[in-house]
């Protein structure tokens, strides 16, 4: 069964733009560099040629990965979701029960994730551990080191 990838319209458009940029800017540059390296002669010992072919393969893999996300995209209208529980698109403030630390996360879809600014994938194990919880409830999240417990302090929507 193919798993859908939840995302906002903005996230979808961002991924489409990234694919377009890769196909129309990066790929032609790599193809040009391959052609230039090919003109150097013997391909068996041509390091530049082999490096650019490898770059081309890695770029194609990235393009295909993004195309797969787009093909499985499920565009979510955040305004239609419940406002009293942790769901896609909300910003949730939690307290680490073990340490008392307060943290804030926004649950986002593919294309919108930015871990440095607290935007985590709703499909990640951490995101899934929070989904469906209400203010005052405790979420248990499985991590390699065991289970972490987080108390839900606040749920907000920035619509």
Curated annotation (Swiss-Prot):
InterPro entries with a match to the protein in the record: GreA/GreB_C_sf, TF_GreA/GreB_CS, Tscrpt_elong_fac_GreA, Tscrpt_elong_fac_GreA/B, Tscrpt_elong_fac_GreA/B_C, Tscrpt_elong_fac_GreA/B_fam, Tscrpt_elong_fac_GreA/B_N, Tscrpt_elong_fac_GreA/B_N_sf
Protein's GO biological process: DNA-templated transcription elongation; regulation of DNA-templated transcription elongation
Coiled-coil stretches:
53-73
Q: Name one GO molecular function term.
A: DNA binding
Write the record's keywords in alphabetical order, separated by commas. Coiled coil, DNA-binding, Transcription, Transcription regulation
Short name of one Pfam family for this protein? GreA_GreB
The record's PROSITE patterns line, in alphabetical order, gives: GREAB_1
> Entry's Gene3D superfamilies?
Transcription elongation factor, GreA/GreB, C-terminal domain, Transcription elongation factor, GreA/GreB, N-terminal domain
Question: Which residues span the membrane?
Answer: none
Q: What protein family is recorded?
A: Belongs to the GreA/GreB family.
The record's NCBIfam families line, in alphabetical order, gives:
greA, PRK00226.1-2, PRK00226.1-4
HAMAP family reported in the protein's UniProt record: GreA_GreB (MF_00105)
Q: What does this protein do?
A: Necessary for efficient RNA polymerase transcription elongation past template-encoded arresting sites. The arresting sites in DNA have the property of trapping a certain fraction of elongating RNA polymerases that pass through, resulting in locked ternary complexes. Cleavage of the nascent transcript by cleavage factors such as GreA or GreB allows the resumption of elongation from the new 3'terminus. GreA releases sequences of 2 to 3 nucleotides.
Q: What is this protein called?
A: Transcription elongation factor GreA
Q: Which organism is it from?
A: Rhodopirellula baltica (strain DSM 10527 / NCIMB 13988 / SH1)
Lineage, broadest ranks: Bacteria, Pseudomonadati, Planctomycetota, Planctomycetia, Pirellulales
State which gene encodes it: greA
């Amino acid at each position: 069964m193919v798993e859908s990838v939840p995302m906002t319209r903005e996230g979808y458009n961002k991924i489409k733009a990234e694919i377009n940029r890769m196909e129309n800017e990066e790929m032609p540059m790599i193809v040009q560099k391959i052609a230039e390296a090919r003109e150097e002669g013997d391909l068996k010992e041509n390091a530049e040629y082999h490096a650019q072919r490898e770059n081309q393969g890695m770029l194609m893999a990235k393009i295909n990965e993004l195309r797969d996300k787009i093909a499985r995209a499920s565009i979510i209208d955040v305004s239609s979701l419940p406002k009293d529980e942790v769901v896609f698109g909300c910003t949730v403030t939690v307290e680490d029960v073990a340490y008392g630390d307060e943290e804030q996360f926004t649950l986002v879809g593919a294309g919108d994730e930015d871990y440095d600014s607290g935007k985590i994938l709703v499909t990640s194990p951490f995101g899934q551990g929070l989904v469906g919880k209400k203010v005052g409830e405790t979420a248990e999240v499985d991590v390699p080191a065991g289970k972490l417990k987080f108390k839900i302090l606040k749920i907000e929507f920035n619509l």
